[in-house]
Amino acid sequence: MSDYEFDVFISYRREGNPYNWVRNHFHPRLTDCLADHLPDEPTVFIDETMEVGSIWPDRLEEALGRTRILVPVLSPQYFRSRWCLAEWHSMVERERLLGQAGLIYPVLFSDSENFPSFARERSWRDLKKWNKPDLVFQQTVRWIDFVEEIENVAIELARLLGKVPPWEPGWPMRRPDPPMPGMTPVPRF
């Protein structure tokens, strides 16, 4: 392969409300709306599309390296994930090497008061008022506003996608540091 594989890589924590919101609302609506604004069918990476048997750290790294724009879904859970942070910092490093911002398009799911300074310094699209994860949200009046807002996100992403430089092999990739010995996370019941 010698080109981008994905237009957008949705980076999110696979737990709780952000996970359900991405799966139920954000990913499908964004993909549909992007299709209305791109010359070709949009390609949106979400880790749920990985093939069974994939070695997921390798596949995440490969997908991110072949993605034009990272769309992190910001929440407190996001910044507690070593993998989410590795995805974010990989794309920050690419922006630095290229001398070009706009390869990270953050969307705010919740909070923001307790984010690390590197995240608070970056502007984001605030989607907090539509952060309802359950499918019943699609039956509410606010759903129409959400769809209109995602349409605006798609328009902005389409504009940014047109500015992404050509793909290069060897983009910098960060993997999270392994947990410290004896620091194995305790399962929550």
Language-model segment annotations:
Residues 1-35, 56, 101-189:
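C-terminal interaction surface of TIR/SEFIR-family domains
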Residues 19-20, 55-56, 79-85:
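Active-site-adjacent loop/helix micro-motif of nuclease/hydrolase catalytic cores
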Residues 34-47:
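Conserved RecA-like helicase motor-core motifs
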Residues 63-64:
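Structural alpha-helical scaffold elements that stabilize or flank donor/cofactor-binding regions
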Residues 67:
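An anion/phosphate-binding loop that grips the pyrophosphate of nucleotide cofactors and donors
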Residues 70-71:
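Hydrophobic acceptor-binding patch used for acceptor engagement in glycosyltransferases
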Residues 76-97:
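Conserved TIR/SEFIR loop-to-helix hotspot centered on a Trp-containing motif
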